[in-house]
Amino acid sequence: MNLNQIENVYFIGIGGIGMSALARYFKYIGKKVSGYDKTPSMLTSELIESGIDIHFEDNINLIPSNYYVENTLVIFTPAVPASHSEWHYFIERNYQIKKRAEVLGIITKDTFSFAVAGTHGKTTTSSILGHILHQSGADVTAFVGGIVENYNSNLIGTGKTVTVVEADEFDRSFLHLHPDIACVTSMDADHLDIYGTSDAIQASFIEFASKVEDKSKLFITKELPLEGVQCAINEDAVYKAYNVRIEDGNYVFDVQTPSEIMKDLRFGLPGKHNLMNGLMAIAMAKTYGTPTDAIAKAIASFNGIRRRFSYQIKSDKLVYIDDYAHHPTEINAVHQAVRELYPGRKVLAVFQPHLFSRTRDFADGFAESLSQFDEVFLMDIYPARELPMEGITSQWLLDKMTNPNRKIVAKEDLLAEIKASDAPIIVTIGAGDIGEMVPSIKKMLNENI
């Protein structure tokens, strides 16, 4: 497929975090871009402000009339239901229709491509790597699954010869990619609604890893059953972060590499999981040939990602953090970071489960990870692409938890319940529409400090 022959790009599901990055990219390179999404959001508002036409009704009459079959590419998300009328319109007329991952594969196949895979840490690692490469002057474009605070965008750079992409395991999407340098941050079970078993997920990651023929260009954590360059914190590895300390709320650490020791690197993202993500990005950038001083300067200036341990309020009296975590391992990482930064202080966690299937598959893990917090408010399950499942409810999950300070809180009661809590540390957690509530929670808390 030759993208140069495409004049128009139409997105079904344009408001998704990965889809919107592609929409920004095609808009930047001069294509006419428009699309459909089910609901308005902050992301769709930003796209509309950039000049992209978006509608929120499944209606073929709203498809631009000059989007002809010979000059239009249609990109869809797997979350689109089979009954979608616009989807059928394009299929029946033989339009070129591609998944997001297929298009990323087409864009990146003629570039020097970095791919970041893993059940957790993809967005943070790819964002740090994209930032390092961009700040060092590389001709890079990074497509990431979050809004990077330094750029207020999920697209970093406008380069033509180097790309950074998240290698998403959902729907085996990452098998469309052709990476020159890659990493795998983790291989925990997730997306069991797609894979069925954890063994099937592991097999898919192994197949992805096989795409990197030169194993000196594949970076892994020590516990993974893959052949590659090992990275670790305070353990023997090819790339080792050690002498880790906290100064003024930042990590300061050294990194041992095959060629040198990088001393006193500063990094502002809290939590050992983020330190590991940063180490992976450093290893990939170093292997690419990025100068040490450029890496050090860039990693110190990285401001994080929206909804990834994102500080909303940070004062002596009150701290409010928002995080996208939606898997027990990720919630454990949030808890570890909070306890490391605020030892001995009461922490309220507000969690909105994401997907009925994920809640079912990891219920015991969710119960254990959430019970670590001092107080827990559990919201209703956010369904996303799914229909309800019998017996899978937030009350069912709550009953599995051991923390006595826990309760179900309806969305309409959330502000009042948070206001009534005496916890000085508040964390909202989840991948659903809880993110849309963050501004109103922040406003209420600021008014009551």
UniProtKB/Swiss-Prot annotation:
Subcellular location, record wording: Cytoplasm
Gene Ontology molecular functions: ATP binding; UDP-N-acetylmuramate-L-alanine ligase activity
Any Pfam family the entry gives: Mur_ligase_C
List residues traversing the bilayer.
Answer: none
Question: Is-annotated flag, keyword Nucleotide-binding?
Answer: yes
Q: Which GO terms describe its biological process?
A: cell division; cell wall organization; peptidoglycan biosynthetic process; regulation of cell shape
Identify the main location. Answer: cytoplasm
Catalysed conversion reaction:
UDP-N-acetyl-alpha-D-muramate + L-alanine + ATP = UDP-N-acetyl-alpha-D-muramoyl-L-alanine + ADP + phosphate + H(+)
EC numbers listed for it are: 6.3.2.8
Q: In which pathway does it act?
A: Cell wall biogenesis; peptidoglycan biosynthesis
Q: Which InterPro entries match?
A: Mur-like_cat_sf, Mur_ligase_C, Mur_ligase_C_dom_sf, Mur_ligase_cen, Mur_ligase_N, MurCDEF_pg_biosynth, UDP-N-AcMur_Ala_ligase_MurC
Q: Which residues bind ATP?
A: G118, T119, H120, G121, K122, T123, T124
- Cellular component terms per the entry's GO annotation: cytoplasm
- Keyword entries, A-Z: ATP-binding, Cell cycle, Cell division, Cell shape, Cell wall biogenesis/degradation, Cytoplasm, Ligase, Nucleotide-binding, Peptidoglycan synthesis
Q: Respond yes or no to whether keyword Amino-acid biosynthesis is given for this record.
A: no
Q: What does this protein do?
A: Cell wall formation.
> What HAMAP family would the database entry show?
MurC (MF_00046)
Family of the protein in this entry: Belongs to the MurCDEF family.
Q: Which PANTHER family match?
A: UDP-N-ACETYLMURAMATE--L-ALANINE LIGASE (PTHR43445:SF3), UDP-N-ACETYLMURAMATE--L-ALANINE LIGASE-RELATED (PTHR43445)
Protein name listed in UniProt:
UDP-N-acetylmuramate--L-alanine ligase
**Organism (species):** Flavobacterium johnsoniae (strain ATCC 17061 / DSM 2064 / JCM 8514 / BCRC 14874 / CCUG 350202 / NBRC 14942 / NCIMB 11054 / UW101)
Gene name linked to the record: murC
